[in-house]
């Protein structure tokens, strides 16, 4: 098999990969996705453990062991619901919200650094919302009593606050006395990012031992986010005994999985946002992913329950929990992993099966961004770095391709001599390659080595919050989204908006990429077979269309990579004294040359 056929095979395989990538993995066109806040007091099917009490929720265990849906509260505006109950305000550089003093839930959080759209006046992202709104989503902590006669704080408990807003410099305490010898205290603290620390304590002033089980839950109700692609998952997620488990919301129906673990964490993950309950990493716990129906409404809940805790008369029991609610910033998740010992916290970002490659690529991009302040330029610098890393390999490949160009006249003679004897032709061709030290597969290598990097970079562009709404220059305002321009209206020069049809919605950067691919082809020898030549001529158009639906940052990478490859290949050809090859027979077509 000669060099041209091998090269065509590599390109066809690449096209198949990219077409499959686009069909199965690339997202369908959709409006930007703000976090979907959901859940009333979420469903609490039987918590793990046959004899242990359940973590409470809106659907509470009934006498038969099933669940009884709570009364649904008609939805109201967020502002009116927040005004109905006393609240302790949350004020940090990244968050604004409040803790409901009736029940003690963290059910009101807005992310100050992120907006739904790139426009500066776009609404800020609302992550958590209280019960009674259209999309409730909240976190709850508490105790379950071993003896049903023991009064524990519930969803209607009115807590007394120590006063002031919860800030990184000012923790707050909530207290409640059950009137029967138990005093409950919740100490809330928050850092300057997205991590809450909740210390629960119970002081027993009664004359008898009390048995309690600590619990924590996160719940959401109604319509939940759905991933439009297989690139990432949204839904319940957790790490149990050092193993990551993540699921789709549909996996929780009718009954979600249960886990036994020491330490770990559990929560809900969206594309860019995460809520996570984090117990003491030495604590043994039972965790559950729940789903129940409240009328016609889906209710989703993740929770964990700690081991039995006995509190002697006069003793105080203390349990520590953490709650993360915010953006999935890789450096921040790594920091919490290192500083707090939260295992695999960075895996909340779904880098997929090329995690080992995608994470370093992002870290390099983030390093460049810290110095130049633009992720588009960072992608270009990353491309140069990748070129330098693969330079010895690519250099060897291009030199081998140059040798193949010099062999074109000899190969043409062999085809003319042994054209009817394919076995003999292949034997003579391989002998020729061996004699001159040429590699017929050399042309495949520059294309093949790009595929893993291409996929990993796409994953980085698509799932990292840092790339969300990251601008480049000119018309590119979001590197994670496709090029917004279209050749139909001359890239915005004509005063109308073309329809959002992928067949015609091809922007400027994909066309630039196609041009660079066409120029790169001109440095390669023209195939002797007219059909092969037509296939090569069609490839830039095929790739232009395919990549027009991909992230603009990825198209910029591909175009810039082509330009660097053209420069490198031209310099090597010049040093080797090889001109752009023509088909045997000079300017004649291969078919005519064969007749002369």
For each predicted feature, which ranges?
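Conserved catalytic motifs of ABC-family nucleotide-binding domains
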Residues: 459-514
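Core hydrophobic alpha-helical membrane-spanning segments
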Residues: 8-22, 454-457, 511-516, 541-542
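Transmembrane helix interruption/hinge and helix-loop junction motifs
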Residues: 372-375, 545-555
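Transmembrane alpha-helical segments that form the functional core of multipass membrane systems
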Residues: 346-417, 424, 430-434, 470-474, ...
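Hydrophobic transmembrane alpha-helical segments of multi-pass transport and channel proteins
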Residues: 503, 507, 511, 547-551, ...
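Membrane-interface amphipathic helices and adjacent TM-edge segments
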Residues: 182, 200, 314, 389-454, ...
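Hydrophobic alpha-helical membrane segments of integral membrane proteins
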Residues: 9-10, 553-560
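Membrane-protein biogenesis/insertion across secretory and organellar systems
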Residues: 1-388, 496, 579-596
């Amino acid at each position: 098999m000669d060099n041209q056929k091998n090269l065509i095979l590599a390109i066809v395989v690449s096209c198949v990969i990219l077409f499959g990538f686009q069909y199965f993995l690339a997202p369908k066109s959709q409006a930007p996705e703000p976090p979907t806040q959901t859940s009333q007091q979420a469903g609490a099917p039987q918590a793990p453990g046959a004899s242990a009490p359940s973590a409470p929720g809106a659907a509470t265990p009934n006498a038969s062991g099933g669940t009884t849906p709570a009364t649904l509260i008609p939805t109201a505006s967020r502002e009116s619901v927040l005004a109905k109950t006393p609240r302790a305000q949350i004020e940090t550089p990244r968050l604004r919200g409040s803790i409901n003093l009736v029940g003690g839930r963290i059910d009101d959080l807005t992310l100050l650094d992120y907006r739904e759209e790139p426009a500066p006046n776009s609404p800020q992202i609302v992550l958590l919302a209280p019960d009674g709104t259209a999309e409730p989503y909240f976190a709850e902590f508490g105790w379950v009593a071993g003896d049903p006669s023991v009064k524990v704080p519930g969803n209607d408990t009115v807590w007394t606050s120590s006063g002031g807003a919860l800030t990184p410099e000012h923790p707050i305490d909530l207290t409640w006395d059950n009137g029967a010898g138990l005093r409950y205290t919740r100490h809330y603290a928050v850092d300057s990012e997205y991590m809450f620390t909740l210390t629960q304590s119970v002081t027993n002033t009664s004359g008898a031992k009390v048995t309690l089980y600590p619990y924590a839950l996160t719940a959401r109700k109604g319509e939940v986010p759905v991933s439009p692609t297989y690139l990432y998952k949204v839904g319940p997620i957790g790490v149990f005994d050092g193993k990551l488990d993540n699921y789709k919301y549909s996996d929780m129906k009718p009954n979600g999985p249960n886990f036994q673990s020491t330490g770990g964490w559990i929560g809900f993950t969206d594309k860019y946002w995460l809520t996570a309950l984090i117990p003491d990493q030495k604590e043994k716990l039972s965790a559950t992913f729940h789903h129940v129906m409240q009328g016609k409404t889906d209710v989703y809940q993740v929770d964990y329950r700690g081991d039995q805790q006995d509190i002697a008369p006069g003793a105080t029991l203390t349990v520590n929990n953490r709650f993360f609610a915010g953006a999935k910033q890789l450096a921040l998740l790594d920091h919490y992993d290192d500083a707090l010992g939260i295992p695999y916290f960075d895996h909340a970002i779904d880098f997929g099966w090329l995690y080992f490659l995608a994470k370093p690529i992002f870290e390099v991009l983030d390093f460049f961004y810290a110095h130049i302040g633009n992720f588009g330029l960072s992608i270009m610098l990353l491309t140069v770095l990748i070129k330098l890393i693969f330079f010895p390999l690519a250099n060897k490949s291009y030199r081998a391709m140059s040798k193949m160009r010099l062999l074109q006249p000899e190969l043409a003679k062999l085809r003319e001599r042994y054209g009817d004897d394919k076995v003999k032709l292949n034997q003579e061709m391989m002998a020729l390659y061996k004699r001159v030290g040429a590699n017929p597969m050399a042309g495949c290598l520059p294309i093949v080595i790009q595929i893993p990097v291409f996929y990993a970079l796409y994953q980085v562009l698509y799932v990292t919050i840092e790339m969300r709404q990251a601008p480049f220059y000119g018309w590119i305002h979001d590197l994670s989204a496709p090029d917004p321009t279209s050749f139909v209206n001359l890239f915005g020069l004509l005063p109308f908006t073309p329809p959002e049809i992928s067949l015609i919605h091809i922007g400027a950067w994909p066309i630039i990429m196609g041009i660079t691919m066409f120029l790169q082809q001109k440095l390669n020898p023209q195939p002797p077979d007219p059909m092969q030549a037509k296939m090569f001529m069609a490839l830039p158009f095929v790739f232009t269309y395919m990549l027009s639906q991909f992230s603009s940052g990825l198209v910029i990478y591909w175009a810039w990579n082509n330009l660097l490859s053209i420069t490198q290949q031209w310099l090597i050809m010049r040093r080797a004294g090889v001109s752009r090859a023509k088909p045997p027979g000079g300017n004649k077509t291969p078919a005519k040359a064969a007749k002369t």
